[in-house]
Structure formats: structure tokens, C-alpha cells
Amino acid sequence: MKISKNKIKIIRPDDWHLHLRDGEMLKAVLPYTTAHFSRAIIMPNLTPPITSVADAVNYRDRIKSNLRGKENFEPLMTCYLTDHTDPDEVERGFYEKIFTAVKLYPARATTNSEFGVTKWNNVHGVLERMEKIGMPLLVHGEEADPEIDIFDREAFFIDNVLSGWVTHDFPALNIVLEHITTEEGVEFVKSCGKNIAATVTPHHLVINRNDLLAGGIRPHLYCLPIAKRDKHRRALRRAITSGNRSFFLGTDSAPHTISSKESDCGCAGIFNAQNAVEIYASVFEEMNALEEFEKFASLNGP
């Protein structure tokens, strides 16, 4: 890494959490990612979701067909975990270098998660196989129970699912807790071994729930997990600038049409691929920690 008065030079970053969608939306948003990133973990929550090796191969081919020829970009594919996922299919995809990881969505926790996991015992066999072969599990860490307050769902999930079940039953499973938004998430990762890590988005480093709600609802700042109190934003900033290798870049860039955001029931997700790297760099500069930026953006990660 080289830092001069007006310039920072780092190894080309990787994005460890990205939504590209499909069709015309994929074509429109892909150039923003390839302009900045070398590789990206591609989320599988399409309609229908990516649940098989064949699905992943076809989706990867569609992504690559939209590259403009000069981009050196590698999409890393994931498998959408359902109650009926076959451990053999997961293992085959991993060994054939089609699946990089498996994505766990609690059913109905976020966009296109209705096919997600409804009961944790339903996926015990898959997680056991993943632990055995060293395959990472990517987790949307929120409790989907409507009785749980939306601002408490991440902390509840950590206390009752990750701490209470997953890390207990599968102590060697490689887990990435994606897009953490809370001080509890930071402390959980710091308290665990090297097999537990987390991604942090650019937007959760710069907005809090006042930015979303105070003085009027701003739908383009609505995402899941939802922005929290400012103390949590500050905890995220301290975590990513600490040099701890368990925290790394994952934009969770999630494009939607304007009509899908500006409606009486707007979709969750913030599109940030066009300026994510600059936002991250600004945060590191504000924290007087530019020397740690390359580790977070380009070197840490699964």
C-alpha cells in the first residue's frame, strides 16, 4: 500500500457480499462492480434461487457474458440453503469449484428469502458436511420472528442461534456473519476463533437510524439489517480500523428499481457499488487509520 498527499494505491479489492440480480438489472449494475473489484461473492437470492450446481453454472455464465472483455473480474458463486438442500450437491459444487460458499437466509428475513431455512434442525446434515470439507457458511444474521423488534433481530440471532446452536454444534465450521450492524455483532466476532468473521457494508459505517427516519422516511436508506443507533455505527468503525483480520469488505450492494424503493411497501437494499470503495476510504481517513485500509479491502476475507 502506498499513501501520498492526494492518492492511495492498494491491491485491487474484493467484494465479499454482492447482489447483481439478473437480466437487464445485471447488465446495468455489473460495470460498477468490475470497475473497482477483482472478485465478488455473488448472492444466490434470485427468483427462483440458486440451489443447485447447474443453477450456479448458468448464472455464472450469464454474469460472464455481460463482461465487456477487458475486465479481469471473477464471480464467486454461492448456494442458497433451503430446508431440502442435499449435502452431496453442496459438496460436489465445492469440489468442482462452482460453489465458493453456502448462504443461509432465515426464511422471510430479507429480500427473496421465502425459500430460506425454517427450522435449524432441517439443515444439520448440510452444516455437518460443510464443517467436514471446510466450506464457508455465509449468514444473514437476523431472527425473522415478527414478534422480535426489527432493531433487535441481529442481537437476538447472535445470542439464540449462533451462540446457542451453530457454534456449539459445529465448532470448526467457517462462518461469515454478513453485514453486521451492531456492537453485539462486533463483540461476538472478536470473542470467537479465527473461523468466525464478518463483513461490514459502507452504508452501515455512515448512516444511523436517524438518517433513515428523522424528519421523514428516506426509502433509499432502507436496508436489512436496518440501520441502528449511532453507538453501533461507531462500534463498526472501530472494528474495521483495528487491524483485526476477522472483519472485511462486503458492500451488500443491492440494486432495485426506483419504483420498488419509492412505494408504500418499499424493498430493502442500498445500491452502493458505484462509490463503495470511496466511502470505505473516507471512513478510514476519518478514523486516522488509512494504513489499515488495504488489509480490510484487499487482504482479509475467506
Question: Could you tell me what each predicted segment is?
Answer:
Residues 53-61:
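Glycine-rich loop at the start of a catalytic domain that most often binds anionic cofactors/ligands
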Residues 23-30, 84-96:
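Short, acidic/polar
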Residues 168, 241-302:
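His/Asp/Glu-enriched, well-ordered alpha-helical/loop segment
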